[in-house]
Amino acid sequence: MHFKNGNYLERKIKMLHEKSCGAIVYRKSHGNIEILLIKHINSGHWSFPKGHVEGDETELETARREIMEETGIDVILDPTFRETVSYSPKKDTHKVVVYFLAKAKNFDFVPQEEEIAEIRWVDIGYAVNILTYENDKIIVNKAKIAIKESA
């Protein structure tokens, strides 16, 4: 708000709202649970596969498509595990990211060259040492509990 001649003038800032969907992709390997982490080319941060909702896609459709595009891995999504993260990447942008839990159907990945610098399968307990953002670390811990409960 600004003052002008004793009157309030409201400055309207147009907020951009973005929504992305993705998943914590996991597999069981030699009795251990491993999750798939991706390193983004532009920012260099480690996270989970995710991307923007396109057209009239559902959240689950977006998550499945983005995982396939970024990693080449097909998944079985668990719609009962749904975690959201909200943040503002820019002053005029509000972003919501919806994460599901996804069991990998195949394990060999093919990185999307334009966006992904590296992909790794890592032990779920070690993932918190690689993930860049605190919100992602919290979600991994919730995913670990959900996976163990479903076993």
List each model region and its residues.
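Charged phosphate-binding loop/patch that engages nucleotide di/tri-phosphates or the phosphate backbone
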Residues: 3-9, 129-151
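Conserved N-terminal beta-strand and adjoining loop/helix that marks the start
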Residues: 7-34
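Anionic group-transfer/hydrolysis microenvironments
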Residues: 24, 41, 125
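Short, glycine/serine-rich, charged loops/turns that create anion-binding
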Residues: 28-30, 42, 53
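Short, acidic/hydrophobic/Gly-rich beta-strand patch recurrent on exposed beta strands
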Residues: 36-39
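Short small-residue beta-strand/loop micro-motif enriched in glycine and branched aliphatics
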Residues: 45-48
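Unchanged
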Residues: 51-139
